[in-house]
Regions:
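Conserved ATP-binding subdomain of kinase catalytic cores across diverse folds
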Residues: 334-460, 481-482, 496-546
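Mg2+-dependent phosphoryl-transfer enzymes with acidic/Ser/Thr/Gly-rich catalytic loops
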Residues: 592, 596, 613-616, 736, ...
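PRPP-associated nucleotide enzymes
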Residues: 1-332, 396-404, 420-424, 850-857, ...
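Helix-rich C-terminal or lid/interface subdomains of diverse kinases
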Residues: 440, 444-448, 517, 532-584
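An alpha-helical support segment within catalytic cores of ATP-dependent transferases
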Residues: 421-476, 487-488, 571-590
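Non-catalytic pre-domain segments flanking phosphatase-related domains
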Residues: 562-601, 834, 864-865, 871-872
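Active-site phosphate-binding/coordination module
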Residues: 614-701
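Substrate-recognition element of Asp-dependent hydrolases with the DxDx(T/V) motif
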Residues: 181, 623-647, 697-714, 726-731, ...
């Protein structure tokens, strides 16, 4: 077995080599797919798809002076590229186009005609190989994007044939000037030539194919050819199944601006059920293949499945085969059916539980066989693969909570060892949402509207380098979803081992630690133990910042796909808490025994970081100073009990008051002190929840048990209740039982800790709900951003806002700037740790912190430019 597994993010040299092999084997499907991949790489290079100007254009959205300026810069760069290198590239690209068209004819034809096409293809491929060898290295090094249509979505070439038939049936006029099937890259680049070839079979002799990306240039020559002649031409815009239809809509609008009438531009696509593609123009003519008519459903029909089983078990006495009726394909994963086979041997008739499911077309699906072979014992046994349908062993589905942590760690470590690749190509996947690019989007949140400008220039290069793996492998990518099965003999196997990498969800990453982070998000109770177990298995620790970033991206993905299980925002918050706690407090072993300090959370200890609460460098430096100088810290917050518990664990705090004083938590023994009358309060709370729930727009946070936190309340928030005080926040309204108050909660908590009369030396809060704790403290401070209520109450304010204000308050208490003495100095952080914590901390000084943060990033970027290879 080769040392390295096949990487479908292949460059042109690899694609050309595989193409020559496909021609030798007379494999028309693979030859077609590989030639399309070469075309895609060349087109993306010619259009500068992944260049910084193009990416900035996309990030800046529609319109505006900035976007027009960046677009002009991109066009100038492409013009220069076309003059210097474009002639030879265009010549070879024309050769590729002719080969794609001819191979598409072979794919849609019958077997005999396809064989004839392949017999003729050898000379064309040899000529193409010679041409490719002379291309610039920038073109040869471009990477293929596996098409979602034939990799993730179970589309089949026969679906393209059927779409062409439906168009021909609806538009019988074969005398059109020309038909251009315009594919939306990437998937459209694979679908369009097949539809065009099928249209030629139906008598549309001038049907041709071309491709474009939304926001990119249109193929002007191909569009002009479609208009040539007296009769009207038409443009058929094709893509994989649209969710909103936004990509198709952009291309359609561009084509209409090119001079085509609305009736001359059509959308052609296969559809998932229940996705209305709302972004498509209402007047857009469409040719749609509904989910019920996809070819995969025929391939998974009873007769086809039985035939596949009998071929796979040839030589055995197969008594009978039964399978479920296939459902409808959807975006969540490959369509599959349960299969039961009864096989007779010397001991009698045995029952075998199997599953037949889509895997992908041609070499894109065959990749699953190689991965399964290398991962033997950890994934289900595979018996056959035919025409994009894989037959494998099946077992009982397991929930995430039932998967032992050691099994998860073993699986991740095995992928790291068995699925090694030659290099980490994630850094070359700009514009394709690899993990580092999504991490950049997440960690640019502090820059607000400047984020799209800062990301490509400063944040992207830094995170791209920081997340490059020294031991690259093909990751699973779906460990946060935990699709595991248990066999009849009790072994646990990863069922969707091939669905994540190279998928429509993107998120390419070559670091096995990313898969472990998915497990941490899915199994939060095992999260603390996973890094150590992984280090023990592979002999290498996971750097703290990398572990945090990977968890944040996994949580982001759970939010994106709308996962029903878990709490992605809380998972991301935990990841950030864990990073800051480890870096800033991990070396302070001695438990403080000195005076008490009370801190609010939101706006004081933490800020809003893209919709997720996060602490900052200033706040943690202040917290470190308090701990190092012997002060004990309690939290007083409106957040829920589970969230207070998370922070006490991460920040090593003695306890806290949650839900505005409704409940207190002692971290030492895990005690919970209920501070609201139970029975009466429960009835009143239930009544309020029922009242709020009458509005379908209202969302009740289930973590809150004493107060009621409700979002989506614009009108319902006015639902006054005599037993509650409504506290309006930026994104929610909290209903607090009357009489519940943070200061009383702190007193009760101190009493439960055996410190009933202990004074509070310092308190910091920023809202009217904090006035009680600020007045009870010997030193009560509000950060500089605090509102009018605290000013009216005469509370002392710091000059700086937010977490920088907290640091100033702590400095006044200890007599020097936090971190300014040997006792509380912050340990030296590694470059990657400093990068991530600095990105989270951009807002700790309000808007005044943005420019200094950009300068700090520029310095890091300059240092990176002088250093070869990845850095940590």
């Amino acid at each position: 077995m080769p040392e390295h597994v096949v990487d479908l993010h292949a460059d042109i040299r690899e694609l050309a080599s595989w193409l020559e092999r496909a021609v030798q084997l007379r494999d028309v499907i693979d030859a077609y797919l590989l030639t399309c991949a070469i075309a895609q790489v060349m087109d993306d290079w010619a259009e500068g798809t992944d260049s910084i100007p193009r990416r900035l254009t996309a990030l800046l959205g529609d319109g505006g002076v900035a976007r027009r300026g960046v677009r002009l810069a991109a066009d100038i760069g492409l013009a220069r590229r076309a003059v210097l290198d474009g002639r030879e590239v265009r010549r070879v690209r024309a050769e590729v186009d002719r080969l794609v068209s001819r191979l598409a004819d072979g794919v849609v034809a019958d077997a005999e005609a396809g064989e004839h096409v392949m017999a003729e293809a050898g000379a064309s491929v040899a000529r193409l190989a010679r041409g490719l060898a002379g291309l610039p290295s920038a073109v040869l090094g471009g990477l293929a994007r596996p098409p979602s249509c034939f990799r993730s979505f179970d589309q089949h070439p026969r679906d393209c044939v059927e779409l062409a038939r439906r168009f021909a049936q609806q538009h019988p006029d074969r005398q059109r000037a020309g038909l251009l099937v315009l594919g939306v890259r990437t998937s459209g680049a694979y679908l369009a030539p097949l539809i065009a070839a099928s249209l030629r079979v139906h008598g549309f002799g001038r049907a041709a194919a071309a491709t474009a990306r939304p926001g990119g240039p249109l193929p002007a020559a191909a569009l002009a050819a479609a208009r040539r002649g007296a009769a009207k031409g038409a443009v058929l815009v094709v893509d994989d199944p649209p969710s909103t239809g936004g990509s198709i809509a952009k291309i359609v609008r561009s084509v209409r601006r090119h001079g085509f009438e609305a009736s001359e531009v059509l959308a052609v696509y296969a559809s998932f059920g229940g996705e209305p593609a709302r972004a498509l123009p209402e007047d857009l003519p469409r040719v749609v293949l509904p989910a019920a008519e996809w070819h995969i459903r025929r391939l998974l029909g009873g007769a086809r499945v039985e035939e596949l089983v009998r071929r796979a078990l040839a030589g055995q006495d197969v008594v009978d085969v039964a399978s479920d009726e296939p459902g409808l394909p959807d975006r969540s994963g490959h369509l599959g059916v349960r299969v039961t086979a009864w096989v007779r041997d010397e001991s009698g008739v045995r029952r075998h539980e199997l599953r037949a499911e889509g895997a992908g077309t041609g070499y894109l699906g065959r990749h699953a066989l190689e991965v399964a072979e290398r991962m033997t014992g950890l994934v289900p046994a595979v018996y056959a693969l035919s025409d994009g349908v894989l037959l494998r062993a099946s077992g009982e589905a397991l929930p995430a909570s039932a998967v032992p942590a050691d099994v998860m760690v073993g699986y991740v470590a095995a992928r790291r060892e068995r699925l090694r690749v030659a290099c980490d190509r994630g850094s070359e996947l700009r514009g394709r949402q690899p993990v580092w690019e999504i991490a950049s989007r997440i960690f640019a949140s502090g820059f607000g509207r400047l984020g799209p400008v800062v990301r490509p220039v400063l944040i992207d290069p830094l995170l791209r380098s920081a997340l490059t793996s020294a031991n690259p492998c093909l990751t699973d990518g779906t460990t946060a979803f935990a699709a595991w099965e248990k066999s009849a003999i009790g072994t646990v196997r990863k069922a969707d081992y091939e669905d994540g990498f190279f998928s429509h969800l993107d998120l390419a990453c070559y670091d096995a630690a990313y898969d472990l982070a998915g497990a941490a998000v899915a199994l939060p109770e095992t999260r603390p133990a996973l890094p150590a177990a992984y280090e023990s298995a592979v002999g290498e620790p996971i750097p703290p910042s990398r572990w945090c970033v990977y968890q944040c991206v996994q949580a982001w993905n759970l939010r994106r796909v709308g996962a029903a299980d878990g709490d992605p925002r809380r998972a991301q918050a935990r990841a950030l808490q864990g990073l800051f706690g480890q870096l800033f407090l991990g070396d302070l072993d001695d438990e403080p025994t000195g005076p008490w300090c009370v801190l609010d959370v939101d706006g004081v200890l933490e800020l809003d970081f893209g919709g997720v609460p996060a602490t900052t460098v200033a706040a943690m430096t202040a917290l470190r100073a308090l701990r190092a100088h012997g002060f004990r810290v309690l939290l007083a917050t409106g957040r829920s009990l589970p969230e207070v518990r998370d922070r006490c664990t991460a920040y090593r705090l003695a306890g806290g008051v949650a839900e505005y004083g409704g409940v207190a938590y002692g971290a030492g023994d895990g005690s919970v002190l209920d501070l609201v009358d139970g029975e009466v309060w429960g009835l009143r709370r239930d009544a309020l929840v029922g009242e709020l729930a009458r509005s379908s727009a209202v969302r009740i946070d289930p973590k809150y048990r004493w107060c009621v936190r409700a979002a989506g309340l614009e009108a319902a928030a006015e639902a006054a209740h005599p037993w509650f005080t409504a506290v309006r926040g930026d994104a929610q309204t909290d209903f607090v039982p009357r009489g519940v108050e943070k200061a009383a909660g702190i007193r009760a908590l101190l009493a439960s800790l055996g410190e009933k009369d202990a004074p509070v030396t310092l308190a910091v809060g920023d809202t009217a709900m904090d006035i009680g704790i600020l007045r009870m403290a010997e030193r009560g401070y509000a950060p500089g951003h605090a509102g009018r209520a605290l000013r009216s109450a005469g509370v002392a304010r710091t000059r700086a806002p937010y977490q920088a204000g907290l640091a100033q308050a702590v400095g006044r208490l200890i007599g020097h700037r936090p971190g300014g003495c040997a006792r509380c100095a912050v340990p030296r952080l590694r470059s990657a740790d400093r990068l991530v914590t600095s990105l989270v901390s951009v807002g700790e000084r309000g808007r005044r912190g943005i420019v200094p943060s950009m300068l700090e990033l520029a310095v890091l970027r300059a240092r990176l430019g002088r250093k070869a290879g990845p850095w940590t």
